[in-house]
Swiss-Prot record:
Residues reported in the UniProt entry to bind NAD(+): 80-81, 85, 155-156, 185, 196-201
Active site: 80 (proton acceptor)
Pfam short name (any one): NAD_kinase
PANTHER family tied to this protein: NAD KINASE
Protein name in the entry: NAD kinase
GO MF assignments: ATP binding; metal ion binding; NAD binding; NAD+ kinase activity
Family (UniProt): Belongs to the NAD kinase family.
Originating species: Corynebacterium efficiens (strain DSM 44549 / YS-314 / AJ 12310 / JCM 11189 / NBRC 100395)
InterPro entries on file: ATP-NAD_kinase_N, ATP-NAD_kinase_PpnK-typ_C, NAD/diacylglycerol_kinase_sf, NADK
HAMAP family referenced in this protein's UniProt entry, alphabetically: NAD_kinase
Length: 318
């Protein structure tokens, strides 16, 4: 990066709590003092950022495909929902995205709020690495196979029944061959990154993010064969609604919906463009999983500890 190149960071804060605003101020001021232009995402409605004495003086943008244009990085301060919305902006212009957790579990965040200053310094120093996370590309077709919607997802595509008094009658399809038909509340098609989110709550397995695969999880399906499936990343997964069933919705990452009238189908393939994910440490995913989900590991000794015990029990040879 040359000295004459303007450095810009898009700051995406969750403003639901006063402590979150304070974190956004800290990050913005550190970046500003380092000579980095700060651009702040705001809501179209009343947003406390617009009138804040510090955050109000920075450039403000609303959520759009061009919000992150010209920036070098998207910095997210919030939980998983905030991260997914920020990832939508970063993905549109192929930028890296870094999440700092200000929420509860914050599975998508790289670091916690108590390390915010260190994280911002790493951004200032360009001291981070970027890894690609698999995404999904989505097409919705009507009963005549005409395209009526397109989208993408980082976590999952949730095919949801809109009639809470009945079930969604659907057929699951892999590589244009039928797998099973059933009545259900919906079907989740997830990436490895999204396997710890909605798909996990619906009974799906956890997939390590380095794995290239597509996870399919029927949601409250009424059939003998309703087990989760892990299919090839080269496959096309489709969910086809029956012509006489309830209307449905294909929802990407919880906030980008495409209506699915009866008889329509949604087709999902591996995304052409990944999300560029900022990493600040080399912590194994196993450790992150245990920490975020607070999994009990009491009594674990590990190979190093077991070796010490074996060495202590082995008598010295003459």
């Amino acid at each position: 990066m040359t000295e004459t190149t303007e450095r810009i960071v898009l700051l995406v804060p969750h403003t639901g709590r006063s402590s979150n605003i304070e974190s956004a101020v800290l990050a913005a001021e550190h970046l500003d003092r380092a000579g980095i232009t700060v651009r702040v995402l705001v809501n179209e409605e009343d947003d406390p950022i617009k009138t804040h004495p510090v955050l109000g003086r920075f450039e403000h943008v609303i959520h759009s495909r061009t919000a992150a244009e010209g920036a070098e990085l998207v910095l997210v301060l919030g939980g998983d929902g905030t991260f997914l919305r920020a990832a939508d902006l970063a993905h549109a212009v192929d930028l890296p995205v870094l999440g700092i957790n200000l929420g509860h579990v914050g599975f998508l965040a790289e670091w916690e709020s108590d390390s915010l200053e260190d994280a911002v310094k790493r951004v200032i120093d360009c001291d981070y690495r970027v890894e690609d996370r698999m995404t999904l590309d989505v097409i919705v077709r009507d009963s005549d196979l005409e395209v009526i919607g397109r989208g993408w997802a980082l976590n999952e595509v949730s095919v949801e029944n809109l009639n809470r008094r009945g079930v969604l009658d659907a057929t699951l399809e892999v590589d244009f061959r039928p797998v099973a038909s059933f009545g259900c509340d919906g079907v989740l098609i997830s990436t490895p990154t999204g396997s710890t989110a909605y798909a996990f709550s619906a009974g799906g397995p956890v997939l390590w993010p380095e794995l290239d695969a597509i996870l399919v999880v029927p949601n409250n399906a009424h059939a003998l064969f309703t087990k989760p499936l892990v299919v090839s990343p080269r496959s096309t997964v489709a969910v086809e609604s029956m012509s006489g069933t309830s209307p449905a919705m294909a929802v990407m990452d919880g906030f980008r919906p495409i209506p699915m009238p009866p008889g329509s189908r949604v087709e999902i393939v591996r995304g052409k463009r990944p999300v560029r994910w900022v990493r600040l440490d080399s912590l194994p995913f196993t450790d992150r999983l245990v920490h975020k989900l607070r999994l009990p590991v009491v009594g674990w000794r590990g190979p190093d500890k077991q070796k010490e015990l074996l060495d202590a029990e082995t008598p010295d040879q003459p």
